[in-house]
Design a protein with these regions (language model features):
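Glycine-rich phosphate/adenosyl-contacting loop at the front of the ribokinase-like
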Residues: 1-20, 30-31
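Ribokinase/PfkB-type carbohydrate-kinase core domain
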Residues: 24, 33-48, 52-55, 59-169
């Protein structure tokens, strides 16, 4: 997902970081764990043995660079507050939250626990709105999240316009 890609990109550029997320105890989960750790990213979450398999995504790109994603969120939707490593968050300068995971109640609890832990440690919280459809589904909750917790907001123009329900910004 975008959070894993973000931290992998940061690590590839020489930055340090950790990732909190769910993978299944399957081949894709093992490959993900190996690859992200090979970049130097801390990823200590135990694989799950219950529920759906590790997430996958097929990305189709047209010659004019338009893209369509066919995504199965898989095990990552089972992220919950028990998965949040507060020590890892306290050691981080910025905690990055991905809006795509806001659909599940357990993920919301994990987000809030992570944001609380970051602020208690004097750290910053960032949020990616992810896409306009995600914003439309969660507008009121995202507005509250931004007001109460978010120090850095990542969004494109369409996402910001959707969040604040305005024609321009």
């Amino acid at each position: 997902g975008s959070a894993a890609n973000t931290i992998a990109g940061l690590a590839s550029l020489g930055g340090a970081g950790g990732f909190i997320g769910k993978v299944h105890d399957d081949q894709l989960g093992e490959v993900f764990r190996h690859d992200i750790q090979a970049l130097g990213v801390v990823f200590d979450c135990a694989p799950t043995t219950d529920g759906p398999s590790t997430a996958t995504s097929m990305i189709l790109v047209t010659p004019d660079a338009q893209r369509t994603m066919l995504t199965f969120l898989g095990a990552c939707v089972d992220l919950g507050p028990d998965d949040v490593d507060e020590d890892l968050i306290a050691a981080s300068k910025i905690t990055y939250l991905e809006g795509y995971l806001w659909d599940r109640p357990s993920a919301k609890e994990a987000f809030l626990k992570a944001a609380d832990a970051a602020h208690r440690a004097g750290r910053k919280v960032s949020l990616s709105l992810s896409d306009p459809f995600c914003v439309e589904r969660h507008r009121d909750e995202f507005l509250d999240l931004v007001e109460r917790y978010v120090d850095i907001l990542f969004a494109n123009e369409e996402e910001i316009l959707s969040l604040y329900q305005t024609g321009d910004f």
